[in-house]
Amino acid sequence: MKKIIATLLLLNTYTAIQAQKLESKIPNNVDVLVSANAENLFKLIKVSDIDKSAIGKEILKDLNRSNKTYRVESVVESESDEKKEDSKEIEERKKVSSVANAGIDIKSNAYYFFSKTDSISYHNFYVELKDRELFESMLSKRNKKKIRRMEGYNIIEGRSDIRIWNDDYLLLVNGDVSRGYFSTHKERLDKLKEEKEYGYSFRKRIGKGWTKKYVLDLFNKNVISSIASNTKFQKSKKKNASATLWVRNYGMLMTDLFKSFGSSLYPLYADVGDQNIYGVEEVTANLFFDKSDARILLDMSVSPDMKKSFKKIYNKRMSRDLVNSFDHDKALAFWSISIDTEETLKQYPELLNKMYGGILPKFQEEMEIVGDLFSLVIDEEAIGRLITGDALLVLNDFSKKEVEYTTYKYDEDYKRKEVTKTKEEFVPDFTLMIGSKEEDLLNKFFKLGEKHKAVEIENNVVKFKTKKSDIPFNLYSVVKNDVLYLTTSETNALSIARGNNNFNTKKHSKLVRDNSTVFFVDVNAVLNKIPNKWMSKSEKEAMRFSTDNLNDGVFRVSRMRGNTISSELKISTQGTEENTLKLLLEFINAVAK
């Protein structure tokens, strides 16, 4: 038994080491990192599934386009700068029949990472190679001629990108210089310009030099501190996730983005400094392909100085009056939001100063005054009673309606005459519900509207007087049980006014009340309502496939837990395939036909 346990531990350790081979070559100070987990992906699909898919066929088509006889004129350079010509004929290979036969090890993890300095940012792609010569044979004829053979690596230099590889790894890097840096350090950098060299070509030349040095250092030197030892990144990777996104500090990333614009383009942002302008720190996301649903889970950490405000605004449960105000089983789609209006208004001045004061530091004092005046003028409690912060928009149905529109007719003398015509339009039937504890005030407002002939009131139902040319549907309103209703259905409005609301309200009650925001759509039901006579062949095929295979989609944002706000996007299917990744490939195949 001990030997078995020891063997299992050894295998587990080996697997972990293999998975972290490339991670140990990625610096710990990267700002954004996306990792594709090959082990989890190939538990879901086979290489042959990719080869047979529309995506795989396109990849193979491109690979075979370059897969012909060619002559390589390569230069081998040593540390002593000795050069010798090495010319050899490469025989024509057989047609590539699988994406696994392109030299890249597709069953090893792949990584994209973004790193930056104050002068330049780098987009990096790192993968493992299975066969260097095979990989090189897949390059275009032009790129094959650009290969430079160095001691320990091979390199192709493009205009702003560099490819470097050896027998084991391939690194692709694209450098993007900061205009802001060149503006700030113009006097010093201008001394490096060559004769008759203009701004764009100068920036490209300098940026290319920086990029090459960065690439050679990254590829050839051992990374002292790698992302493999970063506990936050390692913790962000969830079990069974096919891919993981990790952002070190979103707020600081956006700050640096503003700074990179430069004072010449965005003078207001010139002095942003090193402030986290949005108060959002670490962001992580994980992608899952399960049997009957595909999911993206996202976690967002809020900075300590923003946590207090966010918690007061978002930690509110939606009123049951709203949750129980529609039939959960019949809704085609709905969007809900629940925030504390009173607390939002109270926190607004401080948030205004922290967020926009950081973006526009030159106007920080003005921001503070605006915030103070806002607090002085606004009665947060009164507005919080008028609009509680609970809102629900429900799509009930779609219908065909004849609507008027204006066009022009020309007589024999080419004089224009306005003509009113009618056409059939596909319009939504919806209900908007807004929480309010000021029923009397709202009814007074509608009475005033009736006095000025803007609305009609009958049986406690308010009908807005609108031109059919402005909106293609009628609009009705009812105030009942601390809820303001706006609906396109007169029948629905009368039912609400009479209190005849025997709805099924169990299906989504927990989902809505446990989250600050929810967007739900019954994909199948919505698609069955949409006419397809004007759709293209591919659109009809996409619609047919979706109707046959999808159930519903949900996007939700949780209330704050600690200093974290979590969200989830989930697409549920009918489970017709082994997993949703296979279903995704089938969908692409169907649309691509």
Mark where each language-model region is:
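Bacterial Sec-dependent N-terminal signal peptides
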Residues: 1-26, 560, 564-565, 573-581, ...
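Structural boundary/hinge residues at secondary-structure and domain interfaces
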Residues: 20-143, 151, 225-416, 588-593
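Single conserved position on a long alpha-helix in the C-terminal lobe of the eukaryotic protein kinase
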Residues: 34, 86-227, 384-514
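Generic recognition of long tandem-repeat/solenoid scaffolds
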Residues: 151-158, 295-303, 460-469, 484-488, ...
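Short, conserved secondary-structure transition motifs
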Residues: 155-163, 208-258, 328-343, 466-478, ...
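Broad, structure-driven detector of short, well-ordered beta-strand segments within folded domains
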Residues: 161-166, 273-291, 390-396, 400-402, ...
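Extended, charge-rich low-complexity interaction segments
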Residues: 177-190, 252-254, 271-275, 360-372, ...
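Long, C-terminal catalytic modules of enzymes
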Residues: 497-593
